[in-house]
Regions:
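N-terminal glycine-rich phosphate-binding loop and ensuing alpha1 helix
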Residues: 1-57
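Short beta-strand segments
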Residues: 6-10, 50-51, 102-103, 131-133, ...
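Residue-level signal for inorganic ion chemistry
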Residues: 7, 33, 89, 103-104, ...
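Short glycine-rich anion-binding loops that position phosphate/pyrophosphate groups of nucleotides
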Residues: 11-14, 54-55, 80-81, 105-108, ...
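Hydrophobic packing residues within well-ordered alpha-helices of enzyme cores
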Residues: 16, 40, 59-63, 118, ...
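Conserved N-terminal catalytic core of the sugar/cofactor nucleotidyltransferase
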Residues: 33-98
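Short beta-strand-to-loop acidic/aromatic patch adjacent to the donor-nucleotide binding site
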Residues: 96-107
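Conserved core of the sugar-phosphate nucleotidyltransferase
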Residues: 109-175
Length: 175
C-alpha cells in the first residue's frame, strides 16, 4: 500500500504564548517541523506539508536546509480551519496515494513505530489513530459545572496524531 504523509504546520503558537509558529521553534537545535517530518521518511513514499500562506516560503527553506526536500513533495498553503488544511493536503497528494497519515507538525516526537502501526491499521481496517490511555481523572459536568459522572479511566483514550486512512475514505469524509 503506497503511503504518504500530510504534515500540518499552520499553527500560530498562541496557546503556548510563542511569538511565532511553534513548528519553527527549535528542539535541541532542530526545528520542530523537521523532527515531525523525519520519522515518516523511511515509511512513506513522500509528504505534503501544509503551511500558513504567509509561511510557505519559510517552510520550504527550512525543509531544504534540513535535507528533507526530496521527501517533501510539496509545501502548500492551508485553509482557515484544520479541516480546510487537511483538504488542501489531500488535494496535493499524488494520484498513486492509497494510504495517508495526517500528522500535526507540532508533534515533534512521533516515532517510526507509531507510524508503522498506523499504516498496519489502515491495511487491516481502513483507518487508525495514535492514542494513549488517559491517566487523569475525567469528570463529565452539567452546564452549571456540577459533576454528573466520573467515567471509567480504562475506557478512555487521548487521541493523538497521526490519523491514518485509506485515501478514498478520508476524501469521502471531506466531500
Amino acid at each position: 500500500m503506497k503511503s504518504y504523509a500530510i504534515i500540518l504546520g499552520g499553527g500560530s503558537g498562541r496557546r503556548m504564548e510563542a511569538d511565532r509558529n511553534k513548528v519553527f521553534l527549535p528542539l535541541r537545535g532542530i526545528p520542530a517541523i523537521v523532527r515531525a517530518i523525519a520519522p515518516f521518511s523511511g515509511l512513506c513514499a513522500g509528504a505534503v506539508v501544509v503551511a500558513a500562506a504567509a509561511e510557505v516560503e519559510e517552510m520550504r527553506g527550512i525543509i531544504a536546509r534540513c535535507g528533507l526536500d526530496r521527501f517533501v513533495l510539496r509545501v502548500v498553503p492551508g485553509g482557515a480551519e484544520r479541516q480546510d488544511s487537511v483538504r488542501c493536503g489531500l488535494d496535493a497528494l499524488p494520484a498513486d496515494a492509497e494510504c495517508v497519515l495526517i500528522h500535526d507538525g507540532a508533534r515533534a516526537l512521533v516515532t517510526e513505530d507509531v507510524i508503522r502501526r498506523a499504516i498496519e491499521s489502515v491495511e487491516a481496517r481502513g483507518s487508525g489513530i495514535a492514542s494513549v490511555p488517559v491517566s487523569d481523572t475525567i469528570k463529565r459536568a452539567a452546564p452549571d459545572g456540577r459533576v454528573l459522572e466520573t467515567p471509567e479511566r480504562a475506557a478512555l483514550y487521548a487521541m493523538q496524531t497521526p490519523q491514518a486512512f485509506r485515501v478514498e475514505l478520508i476524501r469521502q469524509a471531506h466531500d
